[in-house]
């Protein structure tokens, strides 16, 4: 559960309505893989991840980033039940994929940076603070099955 004020909810949803999920998803996942290269081990089947340009141009990275942001969108629609919303994904990432739950926090922070880059002055400190709460809540929900 994420505790947002009514103003924060409005700001989060207003900005999210302008997000190009395809582009932002691919950019966020790509930047995660570039900045934190050890996360690439979970994506060995994606082909060439040998350089930042290869990662950022990789169609499988872009497609999976879109999928990730689709799940994030679902979370935004269910902020009062994030653990329930992400229960199956948490189980998959914990039991089958064995993803370090810290990676969820890293991806959330990268997403905030990508949103700031894409929205500039529209991504005010207040909007950033609200998004930090959301990505922390999503990361916590995804890590739930690890506890």
UniProtKB/Swiss-Prot annotation:
Q: Which residues bind heme b?
A: 64, 93
Stored InterPro entries: Globin, Globin-like_sf, Globin/Proto, Hemoglobin_b, Hemoglobin_oxygen_transport
- Positions carrying Phosphoserine: 51
The UniProt family comment states: Belongs to the globin family.
Biological processes annotated in GO: hydrogen peroxide catabolic process
Q: Does the keyword Nucleotide-binding apply?
A: no
Subunit info here reads: Heterotetramer of two delta chains and two alpha chains.
What GO cellular component is one of the record's annotations?
haptoglobin-hemoglobin complex
Keyword annotations: Heme, Iron, Metal-binding, Oxygen transport, Phosphoprotein, Transport
In which organism is this protein found? Hylobates lar (Lar gibbon)
Q: Which tissues carry this protein?
A: Red blood cells.
For this chain, one GO molecular function annotation is: hemoglobin alpha binding
**Domain of life, source organism:** Eukaryota
Q: What is this protein called?
A: Hemoglobin subunit delta
Pfam families this protein is in?
Globin
Sorted alphabetically, which SUPFAM superfamilies does this protein's record hold? Globin-like
Question: What are the Globin domain coordinates in residue numbering?
Answer: 3-147
């Amino acid at each position: 559960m994420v505790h947002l004020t009514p103003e924060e909810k409005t700001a989060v949803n207003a900005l999210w309505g302008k997000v190009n999920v395809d582009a932002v998803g691919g950019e966020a996942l790509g930047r995660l893989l570039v900045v934190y290269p050890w996360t690439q081990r979970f994506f060995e089947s994606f082909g060439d991840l040998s350089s930042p340009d290869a990662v950022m141009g990789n169609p499988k990275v872009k497609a999976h980033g879109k999928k990730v942001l689709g799940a994030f969108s679902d979370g935004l629609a269910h902020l009062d039940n994030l653990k329930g919303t992400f229960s199956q994904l948490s189980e998959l990432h914990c039991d089958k994929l064995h993803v370090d739950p810290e990676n969820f926090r890293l991806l959330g922070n990268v997403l905030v940076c990508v949103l700031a880059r894409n929205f500039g002055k529209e991504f005010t400190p207040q909007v950033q603070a609200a998004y930090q709460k959301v990505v922390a809540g999503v990361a916590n929900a995804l890590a739930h099955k690890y506890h």
